[in-house]
Amino acid sequence: MDQIKNKLGEVFHRTMAHWNFDYNKLDETKVGVACIPWNDIDRAFLEGGIFEAIGFSYSMAKEDFAIRTAHQGCEQMARHYEVSDCTCQVVLIDNEVRAEVPTDLITD
């Protein structure tokens, strides 16, 4: 599961780069949230895919506020682009991958 978790962190960084942002350059306290399509997660997605909706926050006073702000951004982007079949979840807090991978996830 840790390998999948770390790959989700890479997908988040790749998605940020797609939108011309560098998560590593954002000031802490920072959070990255992504709308994760658990039913579509496979090796190809983990190696080259991007999330269709994300949210992020940075330079926040408190972690819980950073999480809430990033989560709202993800949900707003998902609504705007009419993304469905995914769940907005925390992927990164500062530089630590915090994604919670379902125990029944099978990737091919």
Explain the meaning of each model-derived region.
Residues 1-108:
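Secreted/extracellular ectodomain signature
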